[in-house]
Structures are given as structure tokens and as C-alpha cells.
From Swiss-Prot:
Part of the 50S ribosomal subunit. This is Large ribosomal subunit protein uL6c. Keywords: Chloroplast, Plastid, Ribonucleoprotein, Ribosomal protein, RNA-binding, rRNA-binding. One of its GO terms (biological process) is cytoplasmic translation. The keyword Signal does not apply. InterPro entries: Ribosomal_uL6-like (IPR000702), Ribosomal_uL6-like_a/b-dom_sf (IPR036789), Ribosomal_uL6_a/b-dom (IPR020040), Ribosomal_uL6_bac-type (IPR019906), Ribosomal_uL6_CS (IPR002358). One of its GO terms (cellular component) is chloroplast. Gene3D superfamilies: Ribosomal protein L6, alpha-beta domain (3.90.930.12). Pfam families: Ribosomal_L6. It comes from Porphyra purpurea (Red seaweed). It is found in: Plastid, Chloroplast. GO terms for molecular function: rRNA binding; structural constituent of ribosome. Belongs to the universal ribosomal protein uL6 family. The gene is rpl6.
Length: 180
């Protein structure tokens, strides 16, 4: 059995869950999330707790036991408090802005890059160089933040580009040059 999978998931009072077949639905103040669990994973929902169990001795179910518990825990956290990912833009003339819910990036290309966020994802821009991605689904928030970063990842010489807040970029020394 998985050490993580054995842990009980606590349900806050403002969260309601339903489990039908292999599908779990979590409702909360921020929204609703739906996920299909793999075969061999069962849930036992009691007053205020969820216990994730494997049915039978399936090797695949044992492998996905801890993952399923963590995904359910993330769903509960998402609909109650939400998730956020912060990005920083570094570079002379690099900036961002919001226009009709679309993120517009000016990051050194000959054109501006426009990103339309998916459903249930909100993007905020503070002082043109700080981007915050907000949402209830941790996986989608991470994917959107990753796609924004991939537009101009930090380069290793001066560190210009888009990076996660707190990310440390290892810089290289430039060319040694010719001795004169």
C-alpha cells in the first residue's frame, strides 16, 4: 500500500462530493471539478473524510493509489482556496498587459504574442513585469504558466526572459575574447 494513499483526505464543511462509478465530483465556493479515477480505485466517503482504497491486488491500482489520493486532495483545495502560479519578466523593453482577458506579451520578438487563457483560468498582470495565473485546477494552472514561460524562457547569459517567481537561472560566462 502507498504511504500517501493511506492518508485520509479531510473535507471542509463548505465542500460537497459525489462519487458515481469511477467519477468524483467536488463542489465548492470557487467552482466544480470532475475527475475520472482509474479502474481498481474506490472511495469511502464518511462524515467529513474521504478514504482512497484499492480494490483487489491489481498492480496498476497499487501504482495509482497515492496519485489518486493526491489528485482528490488537490481538487478539494482548488475549489476551496484555488491555486496560483507567479511569473516574472526580466529584460529591457519586455512587458505584459491584459486586453479583453487576453495576455499580451512584448518580449523581444518583432510581433506581440497574445495568449487566450482557457476556461476557469484568470491571468493578472501587476506593474507590467509580474504575471499571476489563477484557477481551481492545479494541473491547468501549471500548464498555462508553463506555456507562458515557454514563449521566452530565461537565456543563460543575461537571464532575460520569463521565469517562475523564485526560479534561479544559472548564468554562464561570456566568450573570453581575444587578448590585445
Amino acid at each position: 500500500m502507498s504511504r500517501i494513499g493511506k492518508k485520509i483526505v479531510l473535507l471542509p464543511t463548505n465542500i460537497s462530493t459525489q462519487f458515481d462509478g469511477q467519477t468524483i465530483t467536488v463542489n465548492g465556493p470557487k467552482g466544480t471539478l470532475l475527475r475520472t479515477l482509474p479502474e481498481g480505485i474506490t472511495l469511502e466517503i464518511n462524515d467529513g473524510t474521504i478514504l482512497v482504497q484499492t480494490s483487489g491486488n491489481s498492480k496498476r491500482a497499487n501504482q495509482l493509489h497515492g496519485l489518486s489520493r493526491t489528485l482528490i486532495s488537490n481538487m478539494i483545495e482548488g475549489v476551496s482556496t484555488g491555486f496560483s502560479k507567479k511569473l516574472q519578466i526580466q529584460g529591457v523593453g519586455y512587458r505584459s498587459q491584459i486586453d479583453n482577458n487576453n495576455l499580451i506579451l512584448s518580449v523581444g520578438y518583432s510581433h506581440v504574442v497574445t495568449i487566450q487563457p482557457p476556461q476557469n483560468i484568470e491571468i493578472k498582470v501587476e506593474n507590467n513585469t509580474s504575471i499571476t495565473v489563477l484557477g481551481i485546477d492545479k494541473e491547468v494552472v501549471g500548464q498555462v504558466a508553463s506555456s507562458i514561460r515557454s514563449i521566452r524562457p530565461p537565456e543563460p547569459y543575461k537571464g532575460k526572459g520569463i521565469r517562475y517567481q523564485g526560479e534561479v537561472v544559472r548564468t554562464k560566462a561570456g566568450k573570453a575574447g581575444k587578448g590585445k
